[in-house]
Every structure is written in structure tokens, then in C-alpha cells.
């Protein structure tokens, strides 16, 4: 899980979702998981 000021999709399978007011990226590739913080 990467914590970044700006989250961007890295590949085509990355999805941007909002959970509890936080922006997250979920993906098949665990290295692509990100959250904004």
C-alpha cells in the first residue's frame, strides 16, 4: 500500500474508489494499491 498526496491509476485494471471519504486505488496487482493521506 502506497500513501500518496495524489493517487493515479498505474495500469488498466486500477480502479479509483472512495471509502470513508478517502480516495483509494484497488488493482489486481498488489503493488498498485494506493491511498490518499
From Swiss-Prot:
Q: Give the GO biological process terms.
A: translation
**Gene Ontology molecular functions:** structural constituent of ribosome
Q: Which domain of life is it from?
A: Bacteria
Instruction: Name the InterPro entries for this protein.
Output: Ribosomal_bL36, Ribosomal_bL36_sp
| Pfam hit, one | Ribosomal_L36
Q: What keywords are assigned to this protein? A: Ribonucleoprotein, Ribosomal protein
Q: Give the UniProt entry's GO cellular component terms.
A: cytoplasm; ribonucleoprotein complex; ribosome
Describe the family membership recorded for this protein in Swiss-Prot or TrEMBL: Belongs to the bacterial ribosomal protein bL36 family.
Instruction: Extract the PANTHER family matched here.
Output: 50S RIBOSOMAL PROTEIN L36, CHLOROPLASTIC, LARGE RIBOSOMAL SUBUNIT PROTEIN BL36C
HAMAP family listed in its UniProt record: Ribosomal_bL36
Q: What is this protein called?
A: Large ribosomal subunit protein bL36
| Protein source organism | Carboxydothermus hydrogenoformans (strain ATCC BAA-161 / DSM 6008 / Z-2901)
Q: Which gene encodes it?
A: rpmJ
Amino acid at each position: 500500500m502506497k500513501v500518496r498526496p495524489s493517487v493515479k491509476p498505474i495500469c488498466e485494471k486500477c480502479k479509483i474508489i472512495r471509502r470513508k471519504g478517502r480516495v483509494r486505488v484497488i488493482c489486481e496487482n498488489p503493488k498498485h494499491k494506493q491511498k490518499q493521506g
